[in-house]
UniProtKB/Swiss-Prot annotation:
InterPro entries the record matches: PurS, PurS-like_sf
SUPFAM superfamilies reported in the protein's UniProt record: PurS-like
Organism in which the protein naturally occurs: Methanothermobacter thermautotrophicus (strain ATCC 29096 / DSM 1053 / JCM 10044 / NBRC 100330 / Delta H) (Methanobacterium thermoautotrophicum)
Residues in the signal sequence: none
Protein name (Swiss-Prot/TrEMBL): Phosphoribosylformylglycinamidine synthase subunit PurS
Length: 84
């Protein structure tokens, strides 16, 4: 079975996010009043596995070993079986 995987990675609350701060300042200079700006990285890929459970295990391992730094990042995973 083929699965579409989406991993959304963001800094944990309280972590300094210079990219978001820069965006917020730039928007203010353009006249837009925004607050609580945050940024999120999204990684998408497909996997061919026998079961949803196998994909979940592998993606969790990927996140812990490479995609995320669990000390500073929170992440959400979305997995959908592809038709066909």
């Amino acid at each position: 079975m083929k699965f579409m995987v989406e991993v959304r990675i963001r800094l944990k609350k309280g972590m300094l996010n210079p990219e978001a701060a820069t965006i917020e300042r730039a928007l203010a200079l353009l006249g837009y009043e925004v607050e609580d700006t945050d940024t999120t990285d999204v990684i998408t890929f497909t996997m061919d596995e026998d079961s949803l459970e196998a994909v979940e295990r592998e993606v969790e391992d990927m996140c812990q070993r490479l995609l995320c730094n669990p000390v500073i990042h929170d992440y959400d995973v979305s997995i959908n079986e592809m038709e066909g």
